[in-house]
Amino acid sequence: LKMAESQGADQAYIALSRTGATPTPDNFNADFSGQASWYGGKFHGRRTSNGDVFNQDGFTAAHRTLPFGTKLLVMNRRTGDSCVVQVNDRGPFSGDRIIDLSRGAAQKLNMISSGVATVDVMVLENQK
């Protein structure tokens, strides 16, 4: 497995690719794909569903069913930008979106201005 490092605002995450290569839109082995949105602002400083204090600049995500603590590699299909997030909240609860990302993750994925992006998601570490 080759390690691809993704720098965050406060921390660096190490992502392990199943393909042995740095993930790109052409070789990304996604567990699921779909529309992602992001949230921040009024939620910053509030408690998430698992009790964490939400940091809009962090690298976290809301997912409807994945266990809290699950680490995901998320890639913006259009740009190829990727980052690792950890599930600490529930959602999204609107439309056909599959994941809601913190503002920090959305910024890393270059999806702030669009608000939504088509993403591919790989489960790196699933908490039981």
For the regions a language model picked out, list residue spans one by one.
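Secreted/periplasmic proteins
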Residues: 1-128
